[in-house]
UniProtKB/Swiss-Prot annotation:
This protein is involved in the repair of mismatches in DNA. It is possible that it carries out the mismatch recognition step. This protein has a weak ATPase activity. It holds the Pfam family MutS_IV. ATP binds at G613, P614, N615, M616, G617, G618, K619, S620. This is DNA mismatch repair protein MutS. Belongs to the DNA mismatch repair MutS family. Keywords: ATP-binding, DNA damage, DNA repair, DNA-binding, Nucleotide-binding. GO terms for cellular component: cytosol. SUPFAM superfamilies: DNA repair protein MutS, domain I, DNA repair protein MutS, domain II, DNA repair protein MutS, domain III, P-loop containing nucleoside triphosphate hydrolases. The lineage of its organism: Bacteria, Pseudomonadati, Pseudomonadota, Gammaproteobacteria, Pseudomonadales. NCBIfam families: mutS1 (TIGR01070), PRK05399.1 (NF003810). InterPro entries: DNA_mismatch_repair_MutS, DNA_mismatch_repair_MutS-lik_N, DNA_mismatch_repair_MutS/MSH, DNA_mismatch_repair_MutS_C, DNA_mismatch_repair_MutS_clamp, DNA_mismatch_repair_MutS_core, DNA_mismatch_repair_MutS_N, DNA_mismatch_repair_MutS_sf.
Length: 855
């Protein structure tokens, strides 16, 4: 809207505010409702399933409108945020009684998916992250902020592959990118991607705003002074947070410099296939998180999720965690701590809301209870002798003065919001007590005053009353009015009665008529002062929250180690991966029968296992359990194995399962090849690689050739590789690649039924049992019978159309099959002409070497 003069004063005010937020929905406060107008109304009515109506006219046109009660706004906001919408909250700041024209309004807050802090709008078990990225194809700066905890980090990343892998790990709900980036870049395809003006990322202004935020002269103390791109991204994030919150952000106290070299990198496909915290259906059941999480606090659960999604390569941190878990297991110490931790609650997010000055009364009540529980928690930690646990216990100190302040201030069961009062205890503030007493006890005061005045004057028909026009009064019948004391001031004459006021009643009137509103204003002021007092202690309180969250995770991992029979892995300098009696931590929990544990041995003499065996035999489970054991070891956890000895890995890759990307125009085979290409380009001799059925999405010869070449490449890279395949031809790889060995998952048939034994044994499988699996799956018997006929033919001839179709029940004429019969090779011709008996051993050896170079 450009010409506002045609609009009513109310709509002029609306458009002046709306024009600053054209791409966001605006909730416009009018009395007890948030009204939504024009295109916003049409969109909101559809998204929220509420009635779209119209409100009068402005500029000659009716105004589309819908509305929601302001006291019920949270539920509607939650729905809009889940749908990825941003909402501008515009409140009345003027007094309708004194305003000339429209009541003054202003934007007090902008709610976006990445900057929400209200408890009702958040998933308590997951971080709510917003990220900003700046750079080009070679180098990117990434900044990540969790406004609900104050965690703020930066890192610089080389190349798109690493950036996309990191974005997959942090999974931000909003991603800010520069507006001058070309359209259609991979990062923009993520949900919540928003373009921001290029100057929002400008390095010098970003550096200045960050130094102001942290009250420092430079960023050297955070180790990121030279990270030009990351600083630009962090400055954009900080500006966006301030723009949406419309307040200072005292809970953002530092900037953490993260490095990819410190972590085990997992790409998007690997995270999806390993089902760390989300299963393949998008739910949370039967994930690694669901099995490993028995944390007592929501902040502990979120920290565990961060650990699972960011395994570390820092041996000192991993060993400190292992030692801590061992300490908790001694004399079952975790059992003493966990009940105490349960009393703490989610103070991490409560403190963030205090910093944002939007903490609710019940937040302060929960903080009060948490601070009151800290002394007993400290007592439970006195015998923890692991150095890391002692450090955490020291950080999680007690706050007796704050606990006492909140104990004196906040009612035991305060209301949800400060709006209607009733939050602060009687006795906390004398003036508030008096105002509340006046407001609540006015009736009793009038009864007492009437009794006292009757006794003082001797006028038995005296009455004390109130009306809205004249206020409080003392009423006497006309006959007794002449006997009124001298301090009675005439206020109103009625037929048959006179009304008076006294100095005492006038004083009470002045207090009582404004007592309620003054009490509410006083209580709100005291509440805000209380928040400011707490903000002054935010830094140590946030450190305490972080320490308690880590104590929660470590005690949880100790409990899991005991109840899931997990053992401590041992990190060694020698390159190896040796697992005895390893188990899949998730599958083991859902099976009704005992899980079959298996061994794994990879080292400098064996870097790859070619895994064969029947479908449903357990190949994928064996591979996934290896990856999960390695991942758990790299978060410092104990692992589901009798013993585990390994060296640090740098990446975990998985090429497992089949899926397409229809939206991206990629077939199942294209997705498979893209994942394979990523592995072959980025795997090193410190990487763990899981490859399952590579090449099955194309023709037999193409697929086999690709699988063979990929396996050879990985063997030469010396990556720790588990390569599952149904191409039996690959089992000859150990003959040419000395670092490759064969293993298989065994099965047996009994009464024409397959029995899976799930045991990993040396050597290749003898058969695949494909028809037996099909029969087990319920494929009709006649189809199985016909398949057996085709199988007999295919086992004795290269292609089915090369032989006439046999009559039912009669197999085709047996012939020796050769998978490569249709691919003649000149070396084969030359071999067929060699007269072996006429050659010396030396000549034969030389010829073999020559022929080998031609293969």
């Amino acid at each position: 809207m450009t010409d506002l003069s045609q609009h009513t004063p109310m709509m002029q005010q609306y458009w002046k505010l709306k024009n600053q937020h054209l791409d966001q929905l605006m909730f416009y406060r009018m009395g007890d409702f948030y009204e939504i107008f024009y295109e916003d109304a049409k969109k909101a009515a559809k998204l929220l399933d509420i009635t779209l109506t119209a409100r009068g006219q402005s500029a000659g046109q009716s105004i589309p409108m819908c509305g929601i009660p302001y006291h019920a706004a949270e539920g509607y906001l939650a729905k809009l945020v889940k749908l990825g919408e941003s909402v501008v909250i515009c409140e009345q700041i003027g007094d309708p009684a004194t305003s000339k024209g429209p009541v003054d309004r202003q934007v007090v807050r902008i709610i976006t998916p990445g900057t929400i802090s209200d408890e009702a709008l958040l998933d308590e078990r997951r971080d709510n992250l917003i990220a900003a990225v700046l750079g080009d194809e070679r180098l990117f700066g990434l900044a990540v902020l969790d406004i609900t905890s104050g965690n703020f980090s930066v890192l610089e990343i080389k190349g798109w592959e690493n950036l996309l892998a990191e974005l997959e790990r942090i999974n931000p709900v909003e991603l800010l990118i520069p507006d001058d980036w070309p359209q259609g870049l991979p990062a923009e395809k993520r949900r919540g991607a928003r373009r921001r003006a290029p100057w929002d990322f400008e390095r010098d202004s970003a550096h200045k705003s960050l130094c102001q935020q942290f009250s420092t002269q430079d960023l050297k103390g955070f180790g990121c002074e030279t990270l030009t791109l990351a600083i630009g991204a962090a400055g954009c994030l900080l500006g966006y947070a301030k723009e949406t919150q419309r307040t200072a952000l005292p809970h953002l106290r530092s900037l953490r410099h993260e490095r990819l070299d410190d972590t085990v990198i997992l790409d998007a496909a690997s995270r999806r296939n390993l089902e760390l915290d989300t299963n393949l259906s998008g739910g949370r059941d039967n994930t690694l998180q669901s099995v490993m999480d028995r944390c007592q606090t929501a902040m502990g659960t979120r920290l565990l999720t961060r650990w699972l999604n960011r395994p570390l390569r820092d041996l000192s941190i991993l060993q400190a965690r292992q030692t801590s878990i061992t300490c908790f297991l001694e004399r079952y110490r975790f059992e003493n701590l966990q009940p105490q931790l349960k009393e703490i609650g989610d103070i991490e997010r409560i403190l963030a809301r205090i910093g944002l000055r939007n903490a609710r009364p019940r937040d302060l009540a929960r903080l009060r209870d948490a601070l009151s529980a800290l002394p007993e928690l400290q007592q439970a930690m006195t015998d923890l002798d692991a150095p890391h646990l002692q450090q955490l216990a020291q950080t999680a100190s007690t706050y007796p003065e704050l606990a006492d302040l909140l104990q004196r201030a906040i009612n035991d069961n305060p209301p949800a919001v400060i709006r209607d009062g009733g939050v602060l205890k009687t006795g906390y503030d004398a003036e508030l007590d008096e105002l509340q007493s006046l407001s609540e006890n006015a009736g009793q005061f009038l009864i007492d005053l009437e009794a006292r005045e009757k006794a003082r004057t001797g006028l038995s028909h005296l009455k004390v009353g109130y009306n809205r026009v004249h206020g409080y009064f003392i009423e006497l019948p006309s006959k007794q009015a002449e006997q009124a004391p001298a301090d009675y001031i005439r206020r109103q004459t009625l037929k048959g009665a006179e009304r008076f006021i006294t100095p005492e009643l006038k004083e009470f009137e002045d207090k009582a008529l404004s007592a309620k509103s003054r009490a509410l204003a006083r209580e709100k002021m005291l509440y805000e002062t209380l928040l400011e007092d707490l903000i002054g202690h935010l830094a140590p309180l946030q450190d305490t929250a972080a320490a308690l969250a880590e104590l929660d995770v470590l005690s949880n991992l100790a409990e899991r180690a005991l109840n899931l029979d997990l053992n401590c892995p041992r990190f060694v300098a020698e390159p190896c991966m040796r697992i005895e009696q390893g188990r899949h931590p998730v599958v083991e929990q859902v099976l009704s029968t005992p899980f079959v544990a298996n061994d794994l041995a990879l080292d400098d003499s064996t870097r790859m296992l070619i895994i064969t065996g029947p479908n449903m035999g357990g190949k994928s489970t064996y591979m996934r359990q290896t990856a999960l054991i390695v991942l758990l070891a790299h978060i410092g956890s104990f692992v589901p194995a009798a013993s585990c000895e390994l060296s640090l890995v740098d990446r975990i890759f998985t090429r497992i399962g089949s899926s397409d990307d229809l939206a991206g125009g990629r077939s199942t085979f294209m997705v498979e090849m893209s994942e394979t290409a990523n592995i072959l380009h980025n795997a090193t001799d410190k990487s763990l690689v899981l490859m399952d059925e590579v090449g099955r999405g194309t023709s037999t010869f193409d697929g086999l050739s690709l699988a063979w070449a990929a396996a050879e490449c990985l063997a030469q890279l010396r990556a720790y590789t588990l390569f599952a395949t149904h191409y039996f031809e690959l089992t000859v790889l150990p003959e040419s690649e000395p670092l490759v060995n064969n293993v298989h998952l065994n099965a047996t048939e009994h009464n024409e039924r397959i029995v899976f034994l799930h045991r990993v044994l040396p050597g290749p499988a003898s058969q695949s049992y494909g028809l037996a699996v099909a029969q087990l799956a319920g494929v009709p018997g006649k189809v199985i019978t016909r398949a057996k006929e085709h199988l007999q033919r295919l086992e004795t001839t290269s292609l089915p159309h090369e032989q006439p179709r046999a009559k039912p029940g009669k197999p085709a004429i047996p012939q020796q099959s050769d998978m490569f019969a249709s691919l003649p090779h000149p070396v084969l011709d030359e071999l067929s002409k060699i007269k072996v008996d006429d050659m010396t051993p030396r000549q034969a050896l030389d010829l073999l070497y020559t022929l080998q170079t031609r293969l």
